[in-house]
């Protein structure tokens, strides 16, 4: 049983779909579930009765699971926890939530393996210590990939009626879509978590 924790609901959806596709190819009988604030009560009850091979969730939803009466039974088969985008959580209240959850899980799961994933960590040693604690039993894997990166800023054709409030920037959606469709891999940067969620849903639609 594996648990994947991600800071964004939008990212959780993408990860669940990607891991399920991989499982369909390698382990067709296994399922990867999704648990966020948007998950219905019926689906939550089903997940509790019949846990999947893997669960993708957020720090807040993990704490909801840990507050359930029979949570130790639910997590007794847990072997691996993956913390995605650790740099986003590190040093924040939500990061502390993750640290507390991991400490508690370790108290009744003796051989729990924890993975931290990040593409932009400045101080790897500090990030590792906060995530794993004082242990010498760890490995660091660094990817050495050389890529040709092109950065393009998308600006409105006119600034006369620029919407500084509300759905800031969404009027540029058609231009951004053209760029995404032209390339195999595209990163869209937003300033806040809320904007990331907004753009994710808008691009899907």
Model-derived regions, located:
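Loop/turn-to-beta-strand initiation segments
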Residues: 1, 31, 51-54, 60, ...
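Conserved nucleic-acid-binding Ia/Ib motif block in the N-terminal RecA-like helicase ATPase lobe
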Residues: 1-57, 61
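Residues immediately C-terminal
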Residues: 10-11, 61-64, 88-89, 123, ...
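Alpha-helical scaffold elements adjacent to nucleotide-binding pockets in ATP/GTP-utilizing enzyme cores
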Residues: 14-22, 61, 65, 77, ...
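Conserved catalytic network of the ASCE P-loop NTPase/AAA+ motor domain
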Residues: 24-28, 46-50, 71-76, 95, ...
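Conserved C-terminal RecA-like helicase domain
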Residues: 26-33, 193-205
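SF2 helicase catalytic motif II
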Residues: 60-63, 69-109, 113-114
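Conserved interdomain linker/interface between the two RecA-like ATPase lobes of SF2 helicase motors
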Residues: 103, 111-197
């Amino acid at each position: 049983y594996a648990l994947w924790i991600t800071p964004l609901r939008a990212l959780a959806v993408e990860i669940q779909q990607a891991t399920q596709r991989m499982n369909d190819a390698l382990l067709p009988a296994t399922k990867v579930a999704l648990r966020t604030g948007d998950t219905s009560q019926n689906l939550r009850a089903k997940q509790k009765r019949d846990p999947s091979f893997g669960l993708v969730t957020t720090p807040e939803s993990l704490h909801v699971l840990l507050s359930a009466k029979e949570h130790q039974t639910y997590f007794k088969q847990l072997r691996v926890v993956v913390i995605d985008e650790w740099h986003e959580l590190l040093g924040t209240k939500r990061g502390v939530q993750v640290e507390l959850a991991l400490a508690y899980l370790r108290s009744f799961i003796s051989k729990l393996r924890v993975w931290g994933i990040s593409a932009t960590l400045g101080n790897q040693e500090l990030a590792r210590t906060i995530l794993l604690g004082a242990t010498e039993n760890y490995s660091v894997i660094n990817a050495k990939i050389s890529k040709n990166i092109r950065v393009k800023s998308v600006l409105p054709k006119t600034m006369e009626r620029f919407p500084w409030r509300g759905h800031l920037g969404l009027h540029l959606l058609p231009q951004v879509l053209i760029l995404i469709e032209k390339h195999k891999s595209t990163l869209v940067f937003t300033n806040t978590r809320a904007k990331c969620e907004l753009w994710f849903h808008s691009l899907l639609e």
